[in-house]
A protein has these predicted regions:
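A short, well-structured beta->alpha microelement
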Residues: 1-4
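A conserved amphipathic helix/loop scaffold
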Residues: 6, 11-180
């Protein structure tokens, strides 16, 4: 049996409820999940849920939202942002309200300063990160490094990420991708 130290849900827009429930259990049992905007927004048939988002993952992620927008000159702020060259939110942003999580990054804008952009939630035995907007690669790298620390993975990454991509077939005959 393989133990996954850090799981990611990159814009996992359409997902069956059972997969989202497994992700909840994964974090509950000590895993570290990094999820991005629109994760779990619709079911496997691409039917958008009427529930407050991120619906099934809401407790695990410790956030909720029902508003999103397109950023125009929206900057990001927070300790983890300090010293990065590009602090701008890009392309898309969810307006996250806390429901147990701590804020790592806020929107620094007169309209959106009451909302979180990136959060971290200690849920049962594990941690869940939620990234509610597109951002600069340097800031994303910092957030991922923090998640690796929570998973007690140290000294495995060089100065820059070399990304290795592997494709396989799972037990259900579905393609799976691994980004290492």
């Amino acid at each position: 049996q393989v133990k996954i130290e850090v799981g990611t849900g990159w814009a996992l827009y359409a997902a069956p409820d059972r997969l989202l429930e497994k992700l909840n259990r994964y974090v509950e049992n000590g895993g570290c999940l990094v999820a991005t905007f629109k994760t779990g927004f619709a079911n496997e048939n691409v039917k958008v849920s009427h529930e407050v988002q991120p619906r099934i993952l809401r407790n695990c992620l410790g956030v909720k939202y029902h508003l999103f927008t397109f950023p125009k000159k929206v900057m990001l702020r927070g300790d983890i942002v300090e010293g990065t060259d590009n602090r701008e939110a890009k392309v898309f942003m969810e307006l996250l309200k806390l429901d147990g999580a701590e804020v790592l990054v806020y929107y620094d804008h007169y309209n959106w300063n009451g909302y979180a952009a990136v959060t971290r939630n200690h849920f049962a035995e594990g941690y869940a990160y939620y990234i509610g907007c597109m951002m600069d690669q340097e800031l994303l790298k910092r957030i991922l490094m923090k998640a690796l620390e929570d998973a007690d993975i140290k000294n495995i990454v060089k100065e820059e990420f070399p990304v290795i991509v592997r494709k396989g077939i799972n037990d259900f005959g579905k393609s799976v991708w691994f980004y290492l």
